[in-house]
A protein has these predicted regions:
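Long, low-complexity, mixed-charge
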Residues: 1-110, 116-119
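Conserved beta-strand/loop scaffold segments within soluble protein domains that form the structured core
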Residues: 4-5, 97, 105-364, 380, ...
């Protein structure tokens, strides 16, 4: 097979034209201040065990089917432990698969969307390629870890996940700053769920108060496929903006949830866009936002019913834990046929003093009562998750609830 080595050039041309194009939402960032950096020496991951475990990464990998590690722009390892599962760096995948990868590159995310997609194509490095072959059910989760430690650095990997027909996999992506530093993370993730396939995608972020976070994610779900996504962020950060776009074909289903806890002067603009493209597709967008200090978050949720017999629901809840923080929720429902069912509910408020006093009257200290209420607020029922993933999410949520009070 003849490999066209120049097929990426058209994307680079588009990217060069939008290097000054701001995002539609969120705080604008001067991308010229950040450059990719190589690490001076490879650190021992065991030294960062607590940090890695807090974002869902298992250092020993006993209950993992494969793993990918990247620090700054440097790929540390990409390993598959199970037949039917391929894990490579994106550069290795391009070299190995050549023209085949063109069908999955900048398809669900457009390279000229904004300056962050552009910089990922022009200056980005690394990223994982995960492919689950037709008919394979991957027993344990796959984990991907993206870490940053260098000051004024840019980390902009391009990740591609392909779950072929009748396959199933769970992916845990943990992203974190290894120390206090100024940086920009602008990862691109494209996910393709084949016919009758299922992908569970869990992303956990823990950054710091000087980081700008700009993930760009696009998902395409084939006929009768299932995509489940849960995003967790518990951190201070300078700013965050992300709006994953999920497209469902006939009979496909999606469950998109997020739990975001902000503190300090953090600014976030977060949400999902769900497009019910073909008949009998359905999905939910569930968000839980908690703010402390002077933090602010805008939570967006858009569902477009673009075919008959589709169903969608939005549930946005916000909890203000300080008088100076702010939560703004913006649900949008767009029905283009008369036989669709699109609904939403939204609420923003503070902890109920009545409920706190009720728990105190039953023997709980005030901090314990508040912790129980916060834990209950953060709980989301995610359908069909493997038991191991459920336990990990529950454990992470409990740790977050304890750290808030």
């Amino acid at each position: 097979m003849v490999i066209d080595v120049n097929w990426r050039e058209k994307y680079r041309e588009k990217a060069r034209k939008v290097l000054d194009k701001p995002s539609k939402y969120g705080v604008d960032v001067d991308i010229k201040e950040y450059m990719p950096q190589e690490i001076r020496e490879e650190p021992s991951l065991a030294e960062y065990r607590d940090l890695l475990e807090s974002v869902g990464i298992e250092v020993e990998e006993k209950n993992r089917s494969g793993s990918y590690y990247q620090i700054e722009s440097q790929v540390i390892s990409a390993i598959s432990k199970q037949p039917g599962l391929e894990i490579l760096s994106i550069e290795e995948a391009i070299d190995r698969h050549g023209n085949e990868l063109k069908d999955y590159y900048w398809r669900t995310v457009h390279v000229d969307q904004d300056k962050y997609t552009a910089i990922a194509e022009l200056r980005g490095s690394g990223g994982y390629y995960i492919r689950v072959k037709k008919g394979y059910k991957i027993s344990f989760p796959i984990q991907a870890c993206l870490l940053m430690e260098m000051n004024r650095s840019l980390q902009a990997p391009h990740n591609i996940i392909i779950a072929e027909e009748n396959s199933e996999a769970s992916i845990i992506t943990g992203c974190a700053a290894m120390k206090e530093m100024v940086g920009l993370h602008a990862g691109i993730t494209e996910i393709y769920v084949g016919e009758n396939a299922r992908v569970n995608y869990i992303m956990i972020h823990k950054w710091n108060r000087a980081m700008h976070i700009r993930p760009r994610t696009g998902v395409l779900v084939g006929r009768n496929g299932v995509y489940v996504s849960h995003y967790i962020a518990f951190t201070e950060m300078k700013s965050y903006q992300s709006m994953p776009r999920v497209i469902l074909n006939e009979g496909a289903r999606a469950y998109l949830s997020s739990t975001i806890v902000l503190d300090g002067d953090s600014r976030a603009d977060s949400g999902y866009e769900l497009i019910l493209k073909e008949k009998r597709s359905s999905g939910q967008i569930i968000s839980r936002s908690l703010t402390k200090g002077n933090s602010e978050i805008v939570t967006r949720a858009i569902i477009s019913g673009e075919a008959p017999e589709v169903k969608g629901h939005i549930d946005c809840q916000g909890l203000l834990l300080s008088d100076k923080s702010r939560i703004l929720t913006i649900p949008i429902l767009d029905a283009k046929y008369d036989d669709v069912m699109l609904t939403h509910e939204a609420a923003v408020g503070k902890l109920s003093e009545e409920k706190i006093l009720w728990l105190i009257a039953r023997g709980f200290r005030r901090d314990e009562a508040e912790g129980l209420l916060i834990k209950g607020f953060m709980k989301t029922e995610i359908p069909g998750l493997p038991e191991g993933l459920e336990k990990m999410i529950r454990y992470t949520s409990e740790k977050i609830a304890k750290s808030i009070i």
